[in-house]
């Protein structure tokens, strides 16, 4: 028997700690003990308490422990009732310092179990002959264009029906891989991007996507995946950080720990306690309390606290995780939360995917070291993929698994890996990390530089050959032998593999989910308060528009107005549920992650989201009823009021349920929005208000009977119109006015319909929520868009694997065709001259200071100064052909200095002297000769790489450069940064579609290079890249410098070879002061010599990274130890004097030179700027079918729905009801398609706006051409939309086919769709992001709905609101549409005894002779919204720098 569970909190909690053995005693007695009671008395007391504890039955014994209190007294504690302070004290005693005490603590845990002969359960994971293939489109078929979208959809339908092949080709991800991941050993997974690392980790953790074709098998301790629950036996830690932003770090980990439960720890502890009692062994009381706390359910906090400490997250434990909208923890901390989320559970095998991205090397070392201690001491199994492990982190691993192009190149002990490659003729250079070498040695482009056999010519060694050679290498042969001997299943520990699906009981899971949902509702209270405020505003408008003194009860028209008021109440609560859609979709990624990790079943997640929202519906509807019911003058009977209230609550709940369901089905905002609009459309149009029941066609009547709104409307109408207020008799048959109205509108005149409606709504509420649970269970998150591969990439992958000599489409890139060397060289022939000449320029800055207004929170803490100084007078010079690294730990002012020099700051105060080749810097001209590569690679997602570069060149190169030269120059730049093979690839959205991070970095550099700048600034060009990708980017940077340009890069944690590719270093310390400015020297010799000459600075170790050493020896704590200020040391050095002389020399213009001068601010004329922007917008729209194609599809479907529902209504005008129905068709179409247009355009404009900020700052164009292009590109798309909609609907509804009527109809529809779209764009331009824009815009849709003239006609609107009718664009559209179709008819109507023309004028206030004015007004609104959009884009900047 052994202690299976201890991997969780305690042991596997232990999973994080660090291996600096400390000699200090574990708990030295404090001095006060000497004067206190004698230790013998304490021992006696402890022995007595322990003896009492031993006598308790097992259940109680495991829930009691002995701890030493703050005052040294011995006390018995209840494990389940440990408070925060007690937990803190316990951890302080056990693991005071994570780096020093963790290993000793883990050893104590192990020793306690070994003393009584209990072993830890271990897991050996084997995979044999594993093949994994995917299917993808190759070449242009996969590029999303408007045409491809419809073609691919059609082919998909035909292939699903087996009528034709899908046209996808199989692509191999992993090819025949076999190996063993052993327990008690740390295995590092390495490989270049696209090698298949993530796929291998997912396969081993049993989490592969079911669309992949998999053969081969994976076993744990000889057991197949179907014999246990792999998701709970092992933990897969993803490279994506998906968390709920509104929860704190501690809450996130505690929830995870609570769901995962304690595994088998409790059973192990029972056995341990029994054996200790038999052997009469007394354990260490603190270790005993800890082990009991992590084994008893409900005490997850101890595990959480331990993991927080080990991961260094205790400093931000109570900070929100944060997301795009909420400011939270840093990216590096988020990465650690993702790791911690799985470490708090009891899993015994860990598969970790790139857990170090965004962490500095010391933190990565600390975390990996803690994992290593846990794996070694407690017998864990770990396979960890890291991007750029530093040499010291690399040395912590026992085994290396190297993958390349889906094959295993090496798997075995770390010590033998270099020996294997040397046997193949490749050697790792002195000053290169082994991990970096391993990432590059299998790559066609990077291999040659490592070839060492001088007597043999180099030839490319493909992956296949390495893989075959490894099988005959002694490590490979031994692995093969081990694999051929099956695992002895009798050695499998009973507690090693988990067989239960969930960690805790169903009731506990539900409680955990309820607690979390309640917490999130409290954190999101702003949303609920905002919704209530919005309701109050709408209620104020409703009660003053439908004011009781203005509402008599004399005839059917009066009843119609009351009916409108009821309809408004229902619709308001129906649409109020729309917020549920966005909120549900936002939470789905976290749900899918936790569902797949088996934290909880879908029902446990769905029930709390439903049940906890019920009280909110009561509050919202209560506010509405309280404000409107009696003011509008509905039936005063209290019972009827409460019935009205109940119906509103139910419709509100039905709406929430429906939108949650649509979120689960759509899973994406655009798709769900479209579904949402369809749902609202069918509910509304067929609900019985817009078109009466008798008028609904037979083939649509099912829609009427299945619309929840119909039941609500029937019930609410019956409740009101069968009341006392409406019992005035209207004819001899004894019919009351209320009954007559109900019959007239096709509503059932039976009082039981109230309860039928209530029953139906309850049924719908339950049904929608039940379906929500089912879809959460069935559906997986949407894929990463179309899987596409270019023909070239496929050939290159194949060539890499087999060594086939493919002539790749990489024109001019010698490196590809003949495997030329690609190390980052400083020397070599300088590439002089490209197609376009440029002037080399230097930039000098002397005593530059930058300050901002003192933040309010610092003033609150007693800081008296008004300004906060971020740069304290820095000086330096950057010269042509010299590559300068700008370095310093985070927060030292690197990016600030660069923004100041480049003129990118939008606020703050700048002082000091900045000169360009001796002349004072002028920002207008400087933008023309400089480039700035931002850290976040911001590009238009829907254009190709080549188009991005062509566009940048078009707008930034001088007007005299003709098109041919421009294209030649773009080709040269693509060559320089190795983008030729990606020429036709779509850029895509970062991390979602399109280019990889490293490819985006190179595109960012190329976009600046095609402007032919003399000075380039780059902000962290290598962050987030693996060693090989970083080398490719640095090679592009080096090539750029060698053309004679001035290049400055900020850089974070570089490897040795990247660091030494720089010529000079500009090192800053906290507070924005320089501490070293000068040349690096060969192998960093100048830098090392400078710092080692300072008294007390520790010498650099052999083969240590000088960049890491330099940051370590210049920290603030080192300054305190040495008692000096490095900034002072620098100011007193010869280096400082040399730099001052250099600045002086470069600050005087060379004789005969002229200051920079450009005749115009921009390189292209206003018209050319407009054309270029329009060209890019056209490309973007054409390749964005999820927007353009969805909109056309949506329009056609709505046109067909409307055309069939309102079939032939245009010819009917014998009664006023016919006219109202026809008007309803127009009102519903305008509102629906209009709002849909406004909603879907918002995310598009929002994404493009961030690109606009970058391009405008780069001096590509002024704001107006961009705004005009954005406005104009919509016109042809909306025109097509109008033609599709207009032709279908006009012919199906059967309006008169006269040219004037048809053209007026098309005119109004076109401009209405257009102004709605521009309104959506305007809302984004005036707000910081599309989320806020959607909320602001939605408020107006509701108000426009009231004043459109359909729910209440203009003559019936109280005089104090009538002005708003004229300010409502929808009212003008409805006026124009109704009058242009019906305004001239003089037929008499049967039910009101007046002509159509007179009825329109009396009841609706519409006059035919006013039509031209109406037409002009619709155009005015279109121009107004477009102009406000353009003005806002020009004047408002929501970017903060």
From Swiss-Prot:
The lineage of its organism: Eukaryota, Viridiplantae, Streptophyta, Embryophyta, Tracheophyta. Belongs to the ABC transporter superfamily. ABCG family. PDR (TC 3.A.1.205) subfamily. The chain crosses the membrane at residues 526-546, 559-579, 614-634, 646-666, 671-691, 756-776, 1187-1207, 1215-1235, 1275-1295, 1302-1322, 1332-1352, 1363-1383, 1413-1433. Ubiquitous. GO terms for biological process: defense response. It is a multi-pass membrane protein. GO terms for molecular function: ABC-type transporter activity; ATP binding; ATP hydrolysis activity. CDD domains: ABCG_PDR_domain1, ABCG_PDR_domain2. InterPro entries: AAA+_ATPase, ABC2_TM, ABC_trans_N, ABC_transporter-like_ATP-bd, ABCG_dom, ABCG_PDR_1, ABCG_PDR_2, P-loop_NTPase. PANTHER family: ABC TRANSPORTER G FAMILY MEMBER 39-LIKE, PLEIOTROPIC DRUG RESISTANCE PROTEIN 1-LIKE ISOFORM X1. Residues 508-721, 1168-1382 form the ABC transmembrane type-2 domain. It is found in: Cell membrane. The gene is TUR2. May be a general defense protein. Seems involved in turion (dormant buds) formation. Confers resistance to the diterpenoid antifungal agent sclareol. This is Pleiotropic drug resistance protein TUR2.
């Amino acid at each position: 028997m052994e202690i299976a569970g201890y991997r969780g909190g305690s042991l596997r909690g232990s999973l994080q700690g660090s291996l600096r053995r400390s000699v200090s005693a574990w708990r030295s007695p404090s001095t006060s003990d000497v004067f206190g009671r004698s230790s013998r008395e304490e021992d006696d007391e402890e022995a007595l308490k322990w003896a009492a504890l031993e006598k308790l039955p097992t259940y109680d014994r495991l829930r009691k422990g002995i701890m030493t209190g703050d005052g040294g007294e011995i006390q018995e504690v209840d494990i389940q009732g440990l408070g925060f302070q007690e937990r803190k004290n316990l951890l302080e005693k056990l693991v005071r310092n994570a780096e020093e005490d963790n290993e000793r603590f883990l050893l104590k845990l192990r020793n306690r179990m070994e003393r009584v002969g209990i072993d830890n359960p271990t897991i050996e994971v084997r995979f044999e002959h594993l093949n994994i293939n995917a299917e993808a489109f190759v070449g242009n078929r996969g590029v999303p264009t408007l045409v491809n979208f419809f073609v691919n959809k059609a082919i998909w339908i035909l292939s699903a029906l087996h009528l034709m092949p899908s046209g996808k080709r199989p692509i191999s991800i992993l090819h025949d891989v076999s190996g063993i991941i052993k327990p008690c050993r740390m295995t590092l997974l390495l490989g270049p991007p696209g090698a298949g690392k993530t796929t291998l980790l997912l396969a081993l953790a049993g989490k592969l996507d079911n669309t992949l074709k998999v053969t081969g098998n994976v076993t744990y301790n000889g057991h197949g995946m179907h014999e246990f629950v792999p998701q709970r036996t092992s933990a897969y830690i993803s490279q994506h950080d998906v968390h709920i932003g509104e929860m704190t770090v501690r809450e996130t980990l505690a929830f995870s720990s609570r769901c995962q439960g304690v595994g088998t720890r409790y059973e192990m502890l029972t056995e341990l306690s029994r054996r200790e009692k038999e052997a009469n062994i007394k354990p260490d009381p603190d270790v005993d309390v800890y082990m009991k706390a992590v084994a008893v359910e409900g005490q997850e906090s101890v595990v959480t606290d331990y993991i927080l400490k080990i991961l260094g997250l205790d400093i931000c434990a109570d900070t929100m995780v944060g997301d795009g909208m909420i400011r939270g923890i840093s990216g590096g901390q988020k990465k650690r939360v993702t790791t911690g989320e799985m470490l708090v559970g009891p899993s015994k095998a860990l598969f970790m995917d790139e857990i170090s991205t965004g962490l500095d090397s010391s933190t990565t070392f600390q975390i990996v070291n803690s994992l290593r201690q846990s794996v070694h001491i407690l017998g864990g199994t770990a396979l960890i993929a890291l991007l750029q492990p530093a040499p010291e982190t690399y040395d912590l691993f026992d085994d290396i698994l190297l993958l390349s192009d889906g094959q295993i190149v090496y798997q075995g002990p770390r010590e033998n890996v270099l020996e294997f490659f040397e046997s193949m003729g490749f050697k790792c250079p002195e000053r290169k990390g082994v991990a970096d070498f391993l990432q590059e040695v299998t790559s066609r482009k990077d291999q040659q530089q490592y070839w060492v056999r001088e007597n043999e010519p180099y030839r490319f060694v493909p992956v296949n050959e390495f893989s075959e050679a490894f099988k005959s290498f002694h490590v490979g042969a031994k692995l093969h032998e081990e694999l051929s001997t099956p695992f002895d299943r009798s050695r499998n520990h009973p507690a090693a593999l988990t067989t239960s699906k969930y960690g805790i009981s169903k009731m506990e899971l539900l409680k955990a989910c309820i607690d979390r949902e309640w917490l999130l509702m409290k954190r999101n209270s702003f949303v609920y308060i905002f919704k209530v405020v919005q309701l109050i505003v709408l209620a104020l408008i409703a009660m003053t528009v439908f004011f009781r003194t203005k509402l008599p009860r004399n005839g059917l028209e009066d009843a119609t107005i009351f009916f409108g008021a009821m309809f408004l109440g229902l619709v308001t609560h129906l649409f109020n549920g729309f917020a549920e859609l966005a909120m549900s979709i936002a939470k789905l990624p976290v749900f899918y992650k936790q569902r797949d990790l088996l934290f909880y079943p879908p029902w446990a997640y769905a029930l709390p989201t439903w049940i906890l929202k019920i009280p909110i519906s009561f509050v919202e509807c209560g506010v509405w009823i309280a404000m409107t019911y009696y003011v509008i003058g509905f039936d005063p009977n209290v019972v009827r009021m409460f019935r009205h209230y109940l119906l509103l609550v139910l419709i509100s709940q039905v709406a929430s349920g429906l939108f949650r369901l649509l979120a689960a089905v759509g899973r994406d905002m655009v798709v769900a929005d479209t579904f949402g609009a369809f749902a609202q459309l069918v509910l509304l149009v067929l609900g019985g208000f817009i078109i009466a029941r008798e008028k609904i066609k037979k083939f649509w009547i099912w829609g009427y009977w299945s619309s929840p709104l119909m039941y609500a409307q029937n019930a609410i109408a019956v409740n009101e119109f069968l009341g006392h207020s409406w019992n005035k008799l209207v004819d001899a048959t004894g019919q009351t006015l209320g009954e007559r109205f109900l019959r007239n509108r096709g509503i059932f005149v039976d009082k039981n319909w109230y309860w039928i409606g209530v029953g139906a709504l309850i049924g719908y509420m339950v049904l929608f929520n039940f379906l929500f649970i089912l879809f959460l269970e069935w559906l997986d998150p949407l894929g990463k868009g179309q899987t596409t591969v270019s023909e070239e990439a496929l050939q290159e992958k194949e060539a890499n694997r087999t060594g086939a000599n493919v002539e790749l489409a990489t024109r001019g890139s010698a490196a590809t065709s003949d495997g030329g060397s690609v190390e980052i060289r400083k020397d070599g022939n300088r590439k002089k001259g490209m197609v376009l000449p440029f002037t080399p320029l230097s930039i000098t800055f002397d005593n530059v200071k930058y300050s901002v207004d003192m933040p309010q929170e610092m003033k609150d803490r007693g800081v008296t100064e008004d300004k906060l100084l971020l740069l304290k007078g820095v000086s330096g010079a950057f010269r042509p052909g010299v590559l300068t690294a700008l370095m310093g730990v985070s927060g030292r002012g690197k990016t600030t200095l660069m923004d100041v020099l480049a003129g990118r700051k939008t606020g703050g105060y700048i002082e000091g002297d900045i000169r360009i080749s001796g002349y004072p810097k002028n920002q207008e001209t400087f933008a023309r000769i400089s480039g700035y590569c931002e850290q976040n690679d911001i590009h238009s997602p829907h254009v190709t790489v080549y188009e991005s570069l062509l566009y940048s060149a078009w707008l930034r190169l001088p007007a005299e450069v003709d098109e041919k030269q421009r294209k030649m120059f773009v080709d040269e730049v693509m060559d320089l940064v190795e983008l030729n093979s990606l020429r036709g690839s779509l850029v895509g959205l970062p991390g979602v579609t399109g280019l990889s991070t490293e490819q985006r970095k190179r595109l960012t550099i190329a976009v600046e290079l095609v402007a032919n700048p003399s000075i380039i600034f780059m902000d962290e060009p290598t962050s987030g890249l693996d060693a090989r990708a970083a080398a490719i980017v640095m090679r592009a940077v080096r090539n750029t410098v060698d053309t004679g340009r001035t290049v400055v890069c900020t850089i974070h944690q570089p490897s040795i070879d990247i660091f030494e590719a720089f010529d000079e270093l500009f090192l800053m310390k906290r507070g924005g002061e320089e501490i070293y400015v000068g040349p690096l020297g060969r192998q960093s010799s100048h830098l090392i010599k400078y710092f080692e000459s300072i008294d007390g600075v520790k010498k650099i170790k052999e083969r240590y990274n000088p960049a890491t050493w330099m940051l370590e020896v210049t920290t603030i704590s080192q300054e305190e130890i040495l008692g000096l200020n490095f900034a002072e040391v620098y100011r007193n050095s010869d280096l400082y004097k040399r730099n001052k002389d250099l600045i002086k020399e470069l600050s005087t213009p060379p004789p005969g030179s002229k200051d920079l001068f450009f005749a115009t601010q921009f390189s292209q004329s206003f018209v050319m700027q407009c054309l270029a922007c329009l060209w890019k917008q056209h490309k973007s729209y054409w390749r964005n079918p999820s927007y353009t194609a969805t909109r056309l599809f949506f329009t056609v479907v709505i046109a067909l729905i409307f055309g069939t529902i309102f079939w032939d209504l245009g010819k009917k005008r014998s009664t006023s009801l016919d006219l109202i129905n026809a008007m309803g068709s127009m009102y519903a179409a305008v509102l629906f398609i209009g709002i849909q247009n406004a909603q879907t355009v918002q995310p598009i404009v929002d994404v493009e706006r961030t690109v606009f900020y970058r391009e405008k700052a780069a001096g590509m164009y002024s704001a107006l051409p961009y705004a005009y292009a954005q406005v104009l590109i919509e016109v042809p798309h909306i025109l097509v939309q109008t033609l599709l909609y207009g032709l279908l609907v006009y012919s199906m509804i059967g309006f008169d086919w006269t040219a004037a009527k048809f053209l007026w109809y098309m005119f109004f529809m076109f401009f209405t769709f257009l102004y709605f779209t521009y309104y959506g764009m305007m809302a984004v331009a005036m707000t910081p992001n599309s989320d806020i824009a959607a909320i602001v815009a939605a408020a107006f849709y509701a108000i426009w709905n009231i004043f459109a003239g359909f729910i209440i006609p203009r003559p019936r609107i109280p005089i104090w609101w009538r002005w708003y009718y004229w300010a409502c664009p929808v009212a003008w559209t409805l006026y124009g549409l109704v009058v242009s179709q019906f305004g001239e008819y003089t037929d008499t109507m049967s039910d009101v005894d007046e002509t159509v023309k007179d009825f329109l004028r009396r009841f609706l206030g519409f006059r035919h002779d006013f039509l031209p004015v109406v037409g002009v007004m619709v155009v005015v609104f279109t121009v107004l919204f477009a102009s406000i959009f353009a003005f806002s884009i020009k004047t408002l900047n929501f970017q903060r720098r």
